[in-house]
Amino acid sequence: MPRIRTHHAGDLSRDDPRAGPLKSFLVHEIQSEDGSFEGISGPFGQWNRRLEPTATGINQIIDYRSQLPHWGWLVDLASRVALPRLLARNQASTWGPSDLLSHRQASLLCRCATLSLIAGFLGGLISNTLAFLAKDFGETAAAQANALAIIRIGTLVTMIGTALADRLGRRRMLLGSLYLASVAALVTAVAPSMQVVTIAQLVGRGSVAVSAFVIPIICVEEMPKRSRSFAIGVLALPAGLGVGMVLWFLPILDVSQGAWRAMFLVGFALILATRYAGKDLTETRRFVVADHLEPTHHHPKVHPGRFVAIGMTLLLLNVFAAPTQQLQNDYLLEERDFSASRVALFLLLTNTWGFIGVLGGSQIADRWSRKWAAGLGIAGLTLGNTLMFNATGWPMWVASTVGSVVGAMSISSIGALLPELFPTKRRGLANGTLQLLAVAGSVAGLYLVRDRIDTIGYGPTTRLIASFPLLALIPLCFLPETSGQSLEALNDEELPELGSTTVEDEDLGLDEPAIHPIDPTALN
């Protein structure tokens, strides 16, 4: 069991939070009969803290274990570094959640993080291999744009899947969508033509999009109200890692034109990984309660003003984001004469730092304003990506990095707004329908640039579409501020079995101990 030992010179003052049972954002304690402090609530599976007087002061000894699935080792490692400082200050971490997470919530977040990684890999396959795939089939940049536009029609799959999540449950549709996307990857691996690839990825990308909407819904429905953007930001990191893992394999595409097929065969492993990661994932309690209400119970409807405002934001943003992100590899290969290895290096070095924007944006969104975080991110994404397509040499690398870091600030804020703005039994359908507007923007953007790329080039074309995401800031201003508000209060929703219309973590019925008792023999 991990152990942290710190020394405090002299006695602890009465005002020092460590002198008694802690009640902080990290852990809630009670004092045991032997004088030590046992954790009763918090993200740790086991927690024991005791103070031992010495000749020169006080030794604080903490025995803990997160016991979290899949990522517990990382949490334990980070805790060893951060816990002594954070407990001494008794303040929330600059980069951590603003609320105390229960062990159940932390476990769910870890399971969703693994599923996000799988979804990220599946989603990144076609976008990062399309240029090589099209070259193997002898297709042009215009044909790639056409294929991407057709693949976007998979939003119909997304809308159906998210709507079913309101009826059949979040868990069932999340796992089912990842299974279907993995099968689509296997079909792509053996596809005889570009047309078959397009059809397979139409289904695959639509299924990945289902998971991309359902995972945030699960987390927003389970997390405390001041930590929802934090949770979305945390999930964005393994999703980005999944996309980055695709880049690890790009150098093998230099071996032969058909080497891209090997990357899609990973679908076999992802089916097994999905089964492993999802076996202990539970349904959200908000969905369970809402699903068991009497048929006569009134479920709030979607607020039309909110739907239009967030929908127009997504549409205008994607007119720019889809072409610049999807055709970036082709630009580097054709315009800058990069090899597959150099493309992978460029994307890794410029995109890896996006985690800074994700974490920073989530803190702004939770502690200040969702709309400010989203606005800053959209502006940074537009500026950075436009400059990247209009620069050469090191300025191109810097511009791409700026676009990745600042642009990532919008991920956790928009990702939280999408579930927050709609009631429980309408949340999936509303998000799936919004995907139609986002895809409409993507298709419009891809068709706008399709012919212009071959005639006027990438630089002038990106400057032409750069105004659209800036226009997206206008409808964003009309959205309500959701930071720090309960989902029930935001949507005028009553879930009687949860206790009130301002549901907090403790109101959701934690019917199991958040922290398990520590075996005293394990402390020796």
Language-model segments: residues:
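Hydrophobic-ligand binding "helix-grip"
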Residues: 11-68, 77
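Structural signature of the two symmetry-related core transmembrane helices
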Residues: 172-186, 372-387
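Glycine-rich segments within core transmembrane alpha-helices of 12-TM secondary carriers
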Residues: 227-250, 254, 270, 435-445
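Helix-breaking motifs and short loop linkers at transmembrane-helix boundaries and internal kinks
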Residues: 138, 169, 190-195, 224, ...
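Central cavity-lining transmembrane alpha-helices of secondary-active solute carriers
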Residues: 148-163, 212, 348-360
